[in-house]
Swiss-Prot record:
Homodimer. GO terms for biological process: 'de novo' UMP biosynthetic process; pyrimidine nucleobase biosynthetic process. The gene is pyrE. Catalyzes the transfer of a ribosyl phosphate group from 5-phosphoribose 1-diphosphate to orotate, leading to the formation of orotidine monophosphate (OMP). One of its GO terms (molecular function) is orotate phosphoribosyltransferase activity. CDD domains: PRTases_typeI. Its cofactor is Mg(2+). It catalyses: orotidine 5'-phosphate + diphosphate = orotate + 5-phospho-alpha-D-ribose 1-diphosphate. Belongs to the purine/pyrimidine phosphoribosyltransferase family. PyrE subfamily. Orotate binds at S126. Its EC number is 2.4.2.10. 5-phospho-alpha-D-ribose 1-diphosphate binds at R96, K100, H102, E122, D123, L124, I125, S126, T127, G128, G129, S130. The lineage of its organism: Bacteria, Bacillati, Bacillota, Bacilli, Lactobacillales. This is Orotate phosphoribosyltransferase.
């Protein structure tokens, strides 16, 4: 079983992911979605957490061997990033969504050296907007952002476009395609449900029609 498949299995088992193609969720953007993901739940399950953190470390070593600092996005990327940095014996910082409105007004907490090679950790990629904002903030502080590594992606076309335009490499430990395949195999969804989930990936607006 691949890492992507193992993580998809765990996310379903611990109910970090819910699939309801016949009774969709409403995202903050207003989009009706057959999937809801809360990867923060993974922190409460040591087996799942260990699988994810080791997957992060292996992926970073394989794709970004020159990394010098790990950054986590606030708030979901912070615990994962801190554990990864500890496992890799690397410095850790975290990046706020916007600068503090008091004190020194920091957006990045921790010390980033000019030219320091950084990998940013995120838990979930939908369109990628928030983590790309974090990458831009890190670049302004002088970091050399090598890429973003995340637990899971919805594989939305908008995300691919955004990362391409930003010139930032994205790698995820698991993904939507893998998850719905595992969900069907393990009886979480019906054939009709799988069909709807595949349609959502192709067209997030008209998939129910």
């Amino acid at each position: 079983m691949t890492l992507a498949s193992q993580i998809a299995t765990q996310l379903l088992d611990i109910k970090a992911v819910y699939l309801k193609p016949e009774d969709p969720f409403t995202w903050a953007s207003g989009i009706k979605s057959p999937i809801y993901t809360d990867n923060r739940v993974t922190l409460s399950y040591p087996k799942t957490r260990d699988l994810i953190e080791n997957g992060f470390v292996e992926t970073i070593r394989a794709h970004f061997p020159e990394v010098e600092v790990i950054a986590g996005t606030a708030t979901a990327g912070i615990p994962h990033g801190a554990i990864i940095a500890d496992k890799m014996t690397l410095p850790f910082v975290y990046i706020r969504s916007k600068p503090k409105d008091h004190g020194a007004g920091n957006q990045i907490e921790g010390r980033v050296l000019k030219g320091q090679k950084m990998v940013i950790i995120e838990d979930l990629i939908s369109t990628g907007g928030s983590v790309l904002d974090a990458a831009a903030a890190a670049s302004r502080e002088g970091a050399d952002v090598l890429g973003v590594v995340a637990i899971f992606t919805y594989e939305l076309p908008k995300a691919s476009q955004n990362f391409k335009e930003a010139g930032i490499k994205l790698i995820t430990l698991s993904n939507y395609t893998e998850l719905i395949a595992v969900a069907k195999l393990q009886g979480y969804i019906t054939n009709d449900g799988l069909h709807l989930l595949k349609k959502f990936k192709e067209d997030q607006v008209n998939w129910q029609q």
